[in-house]
């Protein structure tokens, strides 16, 4: 079973990678990009029947730094 976990910096946390991408887009002539937030997508292939609580535990313990990042689980 595939589970996607999207991890993003929380609102208010400085995103230097996103800012660098925004700046580079402007330098390439892509005007109008006012902000970029960069995160990561983690695709898990877990055993059928793995419950959401198990995936939540994975996120809490390893996949996301919950002090500065939020995550979204999609099955």
What does each model-identified segment do?
Residues 1-75:
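Non-catalytic terminal accessory/regulatory regions of metabolic enzymes
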């Amino acid at each position: 079973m595939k589970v996607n976990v999207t991890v993003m910096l929380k609102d208010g946390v400085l995103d230097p990678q996103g800012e660098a991408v925004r700046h580079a887009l402007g330098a390439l002539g892509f005007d109008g990009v006012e902000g970029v937030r960069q995160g990561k997508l983690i695709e898990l292939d877990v055993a059928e029947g793995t419950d959401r609580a198990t995936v939540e535990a994975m996120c809490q313990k390893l996949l996301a730094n919950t002090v500065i990042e939020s995550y979204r689980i999609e099955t």
